[in-house]
Amino acid sequence: MYQFQQDNQYFIFNFDRTFDQATEFFQAEFWQKQERVIGSAKGRGTTYFLQTEDWFGVNCALRHYYRGGLWGKLNKDRYRFSDLETTRSFAEFHLLQRLYEAGFPVPKPIAARIQKGKLGICYQADILTEKIENAQDLTALLQTQTLPKETWTQIGRLIRKLHDLQICHTDLNAHNILLQQIEQEQKCWLLDFDKCGEKSGDFWKVQNLNRLKRSFEKEIRRMNIQFTEQNWADLTAAYHQ
């Protein structure tokens, strides 16, 4: 792991060396000129999927951090700086690395960057993570098919494992759960650990599950996904085992 500074930019790479193109790695235009953008996904901003296996060992997802809600309309992507380790991208990088090393199914963190403003009070942030191949999020899958009990059981156990580590996923929703097809088997992954972290106690765990259920109910209305109360019962039964 290599951490370094270039002027007002701070980087961390999951390698033991730096790169001449460190700044460019976090610019979509650089990858577009290299003809290495192989896809994208829309959220608050655009996540770019990059052909980087020959450089980093895996293909990557590049994401810029944006604010949401009303505040995001006034200040779309600047955050107040206090210390490096609590910045959005560095905090997510370290949490992903901790989970990845524990064998939890999350994307491997590849690199993170923050760029301070002229006064050093605020910063902008970006992160590069592993792209999970041959995978779709639950909302995409459930628009065209139902999922068997075994899949809901796997999801329930995955969330329980996360909670047993006392990690609170503050945005646990159907979009942040991926199903990867590996030959005849499916593997579940969790994404987007921005603002997530360790949390004591148990009171928040029920709230976490309730948030997930509300996201399914929202997508029933919005996308007519194929999700039933029995699916939820299978998920929660596995969670409580």
Swiss-Prot record:
It is a peripheral membrane protein. It comes from Haemophilus influenzae (strain PittGG). GO terms for cellular component: plasma membrane. Keywords: ATP-binding, Cell inner membrane, Cell membrane, Kinase, Lipopolysaccharide biosynthesis, Membrane, Nucleotide-binding, Transferase. GO terms for molecular function: ATP binding; kinase activity; phosphotransferase activity, alcohol group as acceptor. Belongs to the protein kinase superfamily. KdkA/RfaP family. It comes from the Bacteria. Its main location: membrane. Its EC number is 2.7.1.166. This is 3-deoxy-D-manno-octulosonic acid kinase. The keyword Nucleotide-binding applies. GO terms for biological process: lipopolysaccharide core region biosynthetic process.
